[in-house]
């Protein structure tokens, strides 16, 4: 079997569909999505609220079941994997950034970035060294021992970015990553996020409703009413 690192296509999605029951009615959220993202590519998933962006990220992030279609990550067909194998893919190959940071409140900035590495099996020394590197790269060298409540919103989100990149994921999924920040702070966080993603060679899918943000990515696909309707 090929190593995951040998696959140029980080993720291949074919005919992905998702529907929910609402009383006697079935609400179709995703309607047959096809998408390929290559190693190192940064993709904007553009669409208004309710278009299905978050549902799509939950599906390809292996955070929810109930989908039909095919999701292939680094050559592994997700539908054929058991829960333990899916968890291993999330841990080893995926990183997540959300609109709200979801940092652990009782852990310092440094500890929040060390934790996913320790779970993956890194030694405390390795985890600390890499966490230092990421946080320093994000201009947080003076905030390593600060707890989330002691950080500004922009600083919290930069720690969340460092945590998402801590295990050098093949694919980072970001859902409106600057949506909770003012425009100036959001621009700074996005710039630093994209710089680090490119430096690591990760691919990324960034969901946004903001065309100005989307134009900073390598490629834009537009999601409307559960369908990919255009690409540029």
Curated annotation (Swiss-Prot):
Sites where the protein binds ATP: 47-54
Pfam families, per the entry: ABC_tran
UniProt record, GO biological process: lipoprotein localization to outer membrane; protein localization to outer membrane
UniProt cross-references to SUPFAM superfamilies, sorted A to Z: P-loop containing nucleoside triphosphate hydrolases
Entry-linked PROSITE patterns: ABC_TRANSPORTER_1 (PS00211), ABC_TRANSPORTER_2 (PS50893), LOLD (PS51244)
Record carries keyword Nucleus: no
Membrane topology (UniProt): Peripheral membrane protein
Known EC number: 7.6.2.-
CDD domains for this protein: ABC_MJ0796_LolCDE_FtsE
Matching InterPro entries: AAA+_ATPase (IPR003593), ABC_transporter-like_ATP-bd (IPR003439), ABC_transporter-like_CS (IPR017871), ABC_transpr_LolD-like (IPR015854), MacB-like_ATP-bd (IPR017911), P-loop_NTPase (IPR027417)
Gene3D superfamilies: P-loop containing nucleotide triphosphate hydrolases
Disulfide feature: none
Principal localisation: membrane
Cellular component GO terms, alphabetical: plasma membrane
Record GO terms (molecular function): ATP binding; ATP hydrolysis activity; transmembrane transporter activity
Top-level class of the enzyme under EC nomenclature: translocase
Record's keyword terms, sorted: ATP-binding, Cell inner membrane, Cell membrane, Membrane, Nucleotide-binding, Translocase, Transport
Cleaved signal peptide residues: none
Family: Belongs to the ABC transporter superfamily. Lipoprotein translocase (TC 3.A.1.125) family.
Role according to the record: Part of the ABC transporter complex LolCDE involved in the translocation of mature outer membrane-directed lipoproteins, from the inner membrane to the periplasmic chaperone, LolA. Responsible for the formation of the LolA-lipoprotein complex in an ATP-dependent manner.
PANTHER family given in the database record: IMPORT ATP-BINDING PROTEIN, LIPOPROTEIN-RELEASING SYSTEM ATP-BINDING PROTEIN LOLD
Quaternary assembly: The complex is composed of two ATP-binding proteins (LolD) and two transmembrane proteins (LolC and LolE).
Protein name as catalogued: Lipoprotein-releasing system ATP-binding protein LolD
Organism of this sequence: Zymomonas mobilis subsp. mobilis (strain ATCC 31821 / ZM4 / CP4)
């Amino acid at each position: 079997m090929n190593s995951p690192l040998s696959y140029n296509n980080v993720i291949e999605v074919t005919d992905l569909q998702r529907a929910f029951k609402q009383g006697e009615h079935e609400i179709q959220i995703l309607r047959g999505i096809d998408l390929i993202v290559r190693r190192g590519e940064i993709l904007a998933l553009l669409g208004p609220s309710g278009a299905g962006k978050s549902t799509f990220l939950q599906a390809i992030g292996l955070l929810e079941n109930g989908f039909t279609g095919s999701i292939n990550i680094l050559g592994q067909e997700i539908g054929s994997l058991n829960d333990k194998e899916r968890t291993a893919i999330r841990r080893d190959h995926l990183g997540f950034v959300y609109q709200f940071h979801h940092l652990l409140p009782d852990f310092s900035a440094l500890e929040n970035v060390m934790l996913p590495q320790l779970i993956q099996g890194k030694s405390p020394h390795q985890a600390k060294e890499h966490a230092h590197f990421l946080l320093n790269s994000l201009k947080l060298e003076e905030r390593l021992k600060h707890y989330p409540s002691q950080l500004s919103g922009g600083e919290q989100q930069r720690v969340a970015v460092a945590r998402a990149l801590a295990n050098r994921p093949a694919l980072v999924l970001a859902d409106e990553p600057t949506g909770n920040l003012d425009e100036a702070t959001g621009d700074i966080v996005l710039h630093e996020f994209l710089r680090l993603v490119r430096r690591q060679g990760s691919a990324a899918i960034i969901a946004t409703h903001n065309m100005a943000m989307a134009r900073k990515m390598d490629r834009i696909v537009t999601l409307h009413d559960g369908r990919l309707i255009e690409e540029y």
